[in-house]
Amino acid sequence: MICAPTGSGKTTVAKTLLLKRGWVLGFFNKALDETAKDFGPEWERLKDWPRFGIDTRQNRLMLWPATKANVSETIAHHSDVFRRAVDAVHVQGHRTLFFDETHYLTGMCGLGREIEYFHYFGRSNNITCVTNMQRPRWVPKIIMSSVTHAYIGRTFDKDDLRHLSNLGGVDATE
């Protein structure tokens, strides 16, 4: 889990971590994200999920759907593309999944159940999740309770601090 305010280097931290992993699929959504665009030549960018899936030998994939004419169309398009990808990964297994802006994916794109599923059952299917988020209280609880490694940037929001104090299932009052 990587949790920090916007502009604090979450994507840069993720890039460093993901280069240490094999078989990575990143879910990207910000049209003009210069940091993500600079991930490097070893990453293959996909604008859509291939109809017949991907070649399992493809090692580093950035699933980065196009922005549409308006916000509603963009969210609907992203939801469709990302949902087809998570369904395929569920069957294939053996991937590290990077979710950029997890709240956008779980909330606006409606992928909360799918991302929760990977946090509950992914390990037994050789799936690792790396989640980027700006606010810990806006993502499903299972993400916070299944964290094994965390990078946490500065926050002064009391609700966020309370959520972070329970990281890994530890009661903040203990």
PLM features per residue range, with description:
Residues 1-19, 72-172:
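Conserved P-loop NTPase motor cores
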Residues 24-25, 60-62, 96:
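Structural motif
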Residues 53-77:
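Conserved P-loop NTPase mechanochemical-coupling segment
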Residues 52-56, 89-92:
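Short glycine/proline-enriched loop/turn "hinge" motifs that connect secondary-structure elements
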Residues 28, 47, 66-67, 154:
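Residues at the C-termini of beta-strands that transition into short coil/loop
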Residues 8-49:
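Walker A/P-loop NTP-binding active-site region of P-loop NTPases
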Residues 21-22, 57-60, 147-148:
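Short, well-ordered alpha-helix to beta-strand connector turns
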Residues 33-40, 54-56, 140-145:
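Short loop/helix-cap segments at secondary-structure boundaries that form the rim of catalytic
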